[in-house]
Amino acid sequence: MAAPFKTLVEDYPRYLKSFELFLERSSEHQCMQDFIHNTLPDILASIGGGRSVFNVMGVGSGAGDIDLEMLAQLHLKHPHVKVDNEVVEPSNDMLYKYKARVSTSPDLAYINFTWNKMTASEFEKQWQEKTPEKKMDFIHMIQMLYYVKDPNATVSFFRSLLEKDGKLLIILVSGESGWGKLWTTFRKQLCYTEMSQCVTIGEIKSFLDSEGVPYRKYVLLSQMDITECFTEGDQEGELLLDFLTEVKEFSKNAPERLKKEVLDVLRHPDCSKEVDGRIIFNNNLEVLVIEP
């Protein structure tokens, strides 16, 4: 049964504010950038089969900052290759920011961008109707499987689009992170049946294992300062609590008992550690690299 709250993503301006605060308070983008610069190039070395044009797809690309860093690494590894880049992103605001970033970025002439303002499921339907035979060299799905109805089916579909030497890259929170503990404890109270907000990489690995699909995995160490969550009435703390629970105005709308239980779990050693009087949440991510 769906939880009796409004989900944060229903209020896009508040979601965006909480997401931007999360990025400010966490090392998430830094750990992704480290992975992109230090590990991804070797993963990308074997794709493309010597073709002169690579087909690349970003699913849930957001404002494109991480996409463009990956494309830059791809270009360094394959400097003479052109790229057809499919961008799948349902948010007008994010697509606008992505396009603005492209327009002010030098040296992107080797990339042809196709903009798809739609969800992953809408894109899947369109793809099957228009270009079912087309194959991709590299697909990335970064922190987006929380927002699909069936994460396993979504992974299976996009994996089916890969060239024989293609790669599908997925980044999600680790099952051993603070998110894993929080969601395991409060799945019934906080998670929604129509959106799989509580999925971790552990569940995707279990699915792939059950299907006999091999993958490589990498852990990205990340943390987030959530100290303000424990100060009653602190606006930034309330925004972070919204982001952590995926509930709009959780502090105002949650029953006192649930609020106390959530805060207790957030302080628990399985979720966070105390460093110099600050509460530091375990925001570890994992990367899966999947082949056809």
Curated annotation (Swiss-Prot):
Gene3D superfamilies: Vaccinia Virus protein VP39
Catalytic activity: histamine + S-adenosyl-L-methionine = N(tau)-methylhistamine + S-adenosyl-L-homocysteine + H(+)
Residues annotated as binding S-adenosyl-L-methionine: G60, E89, I142
Location of this chain's protein in the cell: Cytoplasm
BP GO terms, sorted: histamine catabolic process; methylation
Keywords, comma-separated and alphabetical: Cytoplasm, Methyltransferase, S-adenosyl-L-methionine, Transferase
Residues annotated for substrate binding in this entry: E28, N283
A single GO cellular-component term on record: cytoplasm
Enzyme kind, highest EC tier: transferase
The protein's Enzyme Commission number: 2.1.1.8
Family to which this protein belongs: Belongs to the class I-like SAM-binding methyltransferase superfamily. HNMT family.
Protein role: Inactivates histamine by N-methylation. Plays an important role in degrading histamine and in regulating the airway response to histamine.
Oligomer status and interactors: Monomer.
Entry protein name: Histamine N-methyltransferase
Source organism: Danio rerio
